């Protein structure tokens, strides 16, 4: 009787009528999360440097946080068997909110803030990638990744410079703004009703140890190569986002230099659809190799330059090609994942953030014992150069659009 009194427009649609989430839905969610991360992107290195007093101390803290994040990320598939994915994603967003509140307190609470925001990033990243692998066909992965970057372009472009400006105006401001954005993220996620993802098949036994999937990962060379591309690409971003602002301050350049340059670099996200067309025309292999080569040259030139302004210019030039790697660098891994291993391999793939967050500050802390920050730029450049060589082993037709592939065969 009560059901009959509910207006039709208020009733939830039946499961059969539920619309399958597409590329735009996931791009929207990514764009909202980028508001948080973009705002704090250039704030954390400056706040950490101010609280800890040295680049070496900043590297050590980032190294410890990277270890913690890696362990949490590898355990998330097991946690997902106990906690539904929609609640895991919600918890990740709440990590952002808690991190923003801690950051607003200032002082050493900035370290706690970074820990919480890092856990939020790894949790949301794993959950969202698992959703993408559930609902997006392999042929649409390139378009989906490009849309996700395009929808987040404004946040990554305006966020870093706005975050630094707010930090200079009132230190708690960027952190409190991140809290507001995290609440928007949760609201959008629940409004989208993504649920817990697709059910592949009913389990017939006990849940396996999450670390057991590392064996499946190491047995597939394509997955290893794709993961290494992601790790070194992320190391490139680490060298640019974390160490460029510190290098600018130590070289006597204005404090806002890092935030402004990171914002300008991220503005190239608006042309990612054009980059994707180029990749589809020439292949993923061509995009990955070009990206690693040019980024490596930028870092190596910055390491060798005796003039700070020229070093910063070289880093900026190389960073533009990190955007190309964001478009193409993740595709070799995502295209090789088997449907039955989506959640577990999403967790393995997401570990690239944590591994790069361990490698870069860990090696950086050692380098800073004997060399200036430019030594870190040199190490990152050499690593990127090694990935250029490894990318030569990718299939030359990987990611080429079907029409272009047919045209090449006909020729």
Regions of interest found by a model, annotated:
Residues 2-23, 196-228, 410-411:
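Juxtamembrane intracellular "pre-TM" segments in multi-pass secondary transporters
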Residues 9-66, 222-261:
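Helix-loop boundary and gating motifs at the non-cytosolic
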Residues 55-56, 138-148, 255, 337-349:
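Loop-to-transmembrane helix entry/capping segments in MFS-fold secondary transporters
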Residues 72-84, 271-284, 368:
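Helix-to-loop junctions at the C-terminal end of transmembrane segments
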Residues 87-101, 286-301:
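Structural signature of the two symmetry-related core transmembrane helices
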Residues 123-136, 324-337:
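Intracellular juxtamembrane helix-capping segments at the cytosolic ends
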Residues 174-191, 377-392:
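Symmetry-related core transmembrane helices of the 12-TM Major Facilitator Superfamily/SLC fold
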Residues 340-369:
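A late C-terminal transmembrane helix in Major Facilitator Superfamily
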């Amino acid at each position: 009787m009560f059901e009959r009194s509910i207006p039709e427009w208020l009733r939830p649609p039946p499961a059969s009528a539920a619309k399958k989430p597409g590329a735009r839905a996931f791009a929207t969610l990514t764009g909202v999360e980028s508001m948080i991360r973009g705002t704090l992107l250039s704030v954390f290195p400056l706040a950490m440097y101010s609280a800890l007093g040295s680049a070496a101390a900043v590297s050590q803290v980032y190294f410890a946080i990277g270890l913690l994040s890696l362990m949490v990320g590898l355990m998330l598939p097991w946690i997902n068997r106990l906690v539904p994915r929609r609640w895991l994603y919600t918890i990740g967003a709440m990590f952002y909110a808690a991190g923003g509140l801690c950051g607003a307190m200032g002082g050493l609470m900035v370290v706690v803030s970074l820990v919480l925001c890092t856990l939020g990033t790894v949790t949301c990243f794993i959950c969202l990638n698992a959703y993408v692998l559930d609902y997006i066909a392999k042929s649409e992965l390139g378009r989906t990744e490009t849309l996700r970057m395009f929808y987040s372009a404004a946040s990554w472009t305006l966020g870093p410079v706005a975050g630094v400006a707010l930090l200079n105006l009132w230190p708690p401001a960027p952190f409190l703004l991140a809290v507001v954005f995290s609440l928007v993220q949760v609201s959008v996620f629940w409004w989208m009703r993504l649920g817990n993802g697709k059910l592949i098949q009913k389990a017939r036994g006990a849940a396996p140890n999450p670390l057991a999937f590392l064996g499946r990962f190491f047995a597939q060379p394509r997955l290893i190569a794709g993961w290494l591309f992601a790790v070194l690409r992320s190391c490139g971003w680490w060298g640019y986002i974390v160490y460029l602002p510190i290098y600018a301050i130590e070289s006597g350049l204005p404090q806002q230099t890092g935030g402004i340059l990171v914002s300008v670099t991220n503005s190239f996200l608006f042309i990612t659809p054009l980059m994707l067309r180029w990749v589809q025309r020439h292949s993923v292999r061509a995009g990955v190799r070009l990206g690693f080569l040019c980024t490596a040259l930028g870092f190596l030139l910055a390491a060798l330059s005796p003039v700070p302004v020229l070093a910063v210019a070289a880093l900026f030039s190389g960073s533009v090609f990190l955007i190309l790697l964001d478009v193409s660098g993740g595709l070799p891994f995502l295209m090789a994942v088997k449907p039955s291993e989506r959640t577990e391999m999403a967790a393995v793939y997401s570990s690239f953030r944590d591994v790069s967050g361990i490698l870069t500050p860990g090696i950086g802390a050692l380098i800073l014992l004997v060399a200036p920050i430019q030594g870190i730029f040199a190490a990152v450049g050499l690593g990127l150069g090694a990935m250029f060589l490894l990318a030569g082993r990718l299939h030359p037709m990987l990611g080429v659009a079907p029409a272009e592939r047919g045209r090449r065969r006909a020729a």
